């Protein structure tokens, strides 16, 4: 077990003892986390998996990526080794965490990959990370029609923001979709937050403020017990018609923040199962003061309460 793997296991258990939402993050873990709450990611364009023989196999080539334009790499190819500058790692002899870092870290942008096709042919390609859109983690909308009524539907997979590589954020994207739906003459709006585990609380604040006219939207409680009232940062509303918000047991944190305020202001009807129940806010900070830190901690910094005083 490498030092990084040991630290990850030990400190994760240590942190969770004090707070279930605080966790240790390696550089690769941090990149994975920000990728999950971003609509844009730096990527070579290779989606890979580890098979039962601990071999890394290419599952998919992302269109528009560096791997795609080689016209050489195909699904089913096996990654044998990777090389970055003078560092070379043979997959069979290397820590999987190091290989993950090469794929996920923003530090490694130009890497040589040696792969083997099913035919046995071995070849090497030089790949460069490009900023690619994560279409699975981006807002989209369409119109549902029945009995001459038109309902706009907006799916929000996460509260993504302009983190490490992001060029867009959820509040702006939702505003664009609402504008388009309004132009098409909708009679009502459905916001789908099912399976949305949260993301940027700043984006949750902006999105919440976009659907109420003005007023307080939450009460924050910091580590010292100091409370502050958070007011609507966006004056006015982007939509005034009837609304429905869909949630389930996997809707958490920022999703609950938005949903609670819509309910407290009688702004929307909430439909679905009981949500996850996570009313805390985290931030990611480095554990060292190095210029390029390798270890981080995602730590709880505040609790948030509804304007009614409830936590959920």
Regions from the language model: what does each represent?
Residues 22-41, 50, 57-62, 66-68, ...:
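Cleft-lining beta-strand/loop regions that shape enzyme active-site pockets
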Residues 43-45:
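Structural detector of coil-to-beta-strand junctions
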Residues 1-9, 13-20:
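Terminal targeting/pro-maturation regions of precursor/exported proteins
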Residues 9-11, 15, 75, 188-190:
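GHKL-family ATPase ATP-binding module
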Residues 76-78, 310:
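Structural motif
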Residues 251-253, 295-312:
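Metal-dependent DNA phosphodiester-chemistry modules and their immediately adjacent helices/loops
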């Amino acid at each position: 077990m490498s030092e990084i793997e040991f630290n990850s296991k030990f400190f994760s258990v240590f942190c969770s003892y004090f707070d279930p939402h605080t966790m240790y993050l390696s550089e690769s873990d941090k990149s994975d986390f920000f990728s999950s709450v971003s609509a844009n990611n730096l990527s070579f364009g290779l989606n890979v998996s580890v098979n039962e023989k601990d071999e890394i196999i290419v599952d998919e080539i992302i269109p528009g990526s560096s791997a795609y334009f080689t016209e050489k790499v195909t699904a089913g190819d096996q990654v044998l080794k990777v090389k970055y500058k003078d560092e070379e790692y043979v997959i069979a002899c290397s820590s999987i965490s190091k290989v993950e870092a090469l794929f996920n870290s923003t530090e490694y942008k130009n890497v040589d990959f040696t792969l083997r096709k099913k035919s046995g042919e071995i070849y090497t390609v030089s790949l460069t990370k490009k900023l690619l859109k994560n279409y699975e983690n981006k807002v989209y909308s369409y119109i549902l029609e029945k009995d001459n009524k038109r309902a706009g539907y907006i799916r929000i997979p996460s509260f993504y923001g302009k983190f490490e590589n992001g060029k867009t954020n959820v509040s702006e994207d939702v505003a664009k979709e609402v504008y388009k739906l309004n132009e098409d003459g909708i009679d009502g709006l459905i916001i789908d937050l099912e399976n949305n585990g949260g993301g940027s609380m700043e984006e949750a604040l902006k999105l919440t403020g976009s659907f109420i006219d003005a007023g307080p939207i939450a009460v924050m409680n910091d580590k010292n017990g100091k409370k502050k009232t958070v007011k609507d940062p966006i004056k006015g509303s982007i939509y005034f018609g009837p609304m429905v918000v869909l949630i389930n047991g996997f809707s958490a944190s920022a999703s609950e923040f938005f949903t609670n305020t819509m309910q407290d202001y009688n702004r929307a009807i909430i439909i679905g199962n009981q949500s996850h129940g996570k009313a805390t806010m985290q931030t990611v900070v480095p554990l060292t003061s190095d210029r390029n830190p390798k270890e981080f901690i995602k730590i709880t910094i505040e609790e948030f309460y509804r304007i009614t005083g409830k936590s959920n």
